[in-house]
Amino acid sequence: VYFEASPRWALDQPYQQSASKGYEADGLLYLKSGSKEQNILAKQGDDLRIDWGYFYMVAGKENTAYSVGNSTELRKNFVNGTLNSASLEGEDSNGNMALVRSHGKVKNVTDKIMLGYDDIYSIQYFGTNLRPYWNSKGDRTIEAEMLAAYNEYDKLLARCYAFDKKLMEDASAAGGKEYAELCALAYRQSIAAHKLVEAPNGDLLWLSKENNSNGCINTVDLTYPSAPLYLIYNPELEKGMMNGIFHYSESGKWTKPFAAHDLGTYPLANGQVYGGDMPVEESGNML
């Protein structure tokens, strides 16, 4: 089975320069790619893609071949029966990454590869760059996290299946099949539009991005309509959506006698950027 990933996973624009490589760690094979510039937290806005940090594609070493190169050549080599595992570095259009998992002659087989992203620093929060929550102290490695996920795969998958089943059953009982499908879609959409980090004072921050609107971060009128999901499934994340707004007022950085609209433009949470205050709407939402 052939898997291929493009360096564009880690770029904002296709013309940006990138570098890819393959390596081995703890019995796993890694393919890694990122931009050459690595300007961390240098961009803010709506229709933008992250271009700092690194994308990873990972598989077990046994029965695996991997290579870095031009997409056409990689696919040609696969069709001809082999990847050039000596080619483990490449740049730009020669930086596509390919994995081949070989299972011989089989009818049904279960297998896995892993995709991951280490953004190094995720959010700028009132001038302080914050790491992703899983590495908030800077003492973890992406390789250790990948290895743990690989080893715990069966348990993690069982938990995912159990949660999927419960969500669909509860939502179906509340509103029928179509309602349940909407709830499943909303669950994925909402969670995917947030980033989990820890504030310097230890507060949990679950920061939204206002996608295809204006790119604001931690917008209060996004927090409010998504609240039912988090109040049901994880109230701590709901607190994480509110902590930053409270801090903004309590610190004196926000001086008006009502709630702010946002904390900035994603991923820079340094203060409201929205041009018009919404004192009634946002204060009501926070209450």
Describe the function of each predicted region.
Residues 2-218:
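Acidic/polar, glycine-enriched structural segments that form the non-catalytic walls/loops
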